[in-house]
Amino acid sequence: MPQKFINSLYISFIIILISFSARSAEDLKSIGKFKDWETFTVNENNNKICFAQSIPILRAPKKFERNPSRLFVSFRPIEDIKDEVSTTSGYSFQKEKIVKAKSGKKTFDFFAQENFAWILDTEEEQKFIQAMKKASRVMIIGRTDKGKQTIDHYSLMGFSKAYNTAKKNCS
């Protein structure tokens, strides 16, 4: 398993836990709200992490019970990681299946591991980020471990400012 993936799994897990944990809420600092996106910083063992995140504006199917979904772009300077794109859709993804992100005519593949999915290739991450800066919406399409398809629609209003704020605070 690639080292970047292992590190991503660990850090994304921390971000999710911090995002939902009242105990750790004081460690998580919002540094800007930009329409549908928000930027945060957190210090974990003297490791500063910055990330832009959003929640879906629409989740389908509506009656499917699951935990919250998030789309992230993260920066971890101590590990020389920048522009890391990841998502969680609130359930365990189907094993050995690709999670898709669609924006307009462009499609990007995410590698799924349990509750998280990442773009593993840095060039693809850059292409995806550029697409997000130009688009107004992105859809994340995944399947549960039982095969049920979900689609999370994210607004990209405010993405560029949230992204730039995260990047600036962790450079």
Predicted regions mapped to residue ranges:
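Catalytic cores of transferase enzymes with a strong primary signal for eukaryotic protein kinases
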Residues: 5, 21, 46
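Bacterial N-terminal signal peptides that target proteins for export
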Residues: 1-10
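Bacterial N-terminal signal peptides
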Residues: 10-19
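A generic "folded-domain core" signal
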Residues: 24-171
